From Swiss-Prot:
The keyword Ribosomal protein applies. Belongs to the eukaryotic ribosomal protein eL38 family. GO terms for molecular function: structural constituent of ribosome. Keywords: Ribonucleoprotein, Ribosomal protein. GO terms for biological process: protein-RNA complex assembly; translation. The keyword Ribosomal protein applies. PANTHER family: 60S RIBOSOMAL PROTEIN L38, LARGE RIBOSOMAL SUBUNIT PROTEIN EL38. This is Large ribosomal subunit protein eL38. InterPro entries: Ribosomal_eL38 (IPR002675), Ribosomal_eL38_sf (IPR038464). GO terms for cellular component: cytosolic large ribosomal subunit. It comes from Theileria parva.
Amino acid sequence: MPKELKELKDYLSVLKRPDARSVVVYKKKSKGGLLSTKFKVRCSRYLYTFSVPNQVKAAKVEATIPSHLEKKVITNKKN
């Protein structure tokens, strides 16, 4: 069962942990046209999720991902 993080400070502390392996970034457009971004961090025991509704803030959060973690970006493309 994934653990949901509510605070940015908690998300950043999980990224710095030595057991953090990879980050998957999901960028999904909602019906209203807003872009919602979810960050999923895989650690040894849990999958931690962090959701950001603001696109500008999401870009800043994505820039804070350390380079030693494997990063995968998935966008929702429906025609």
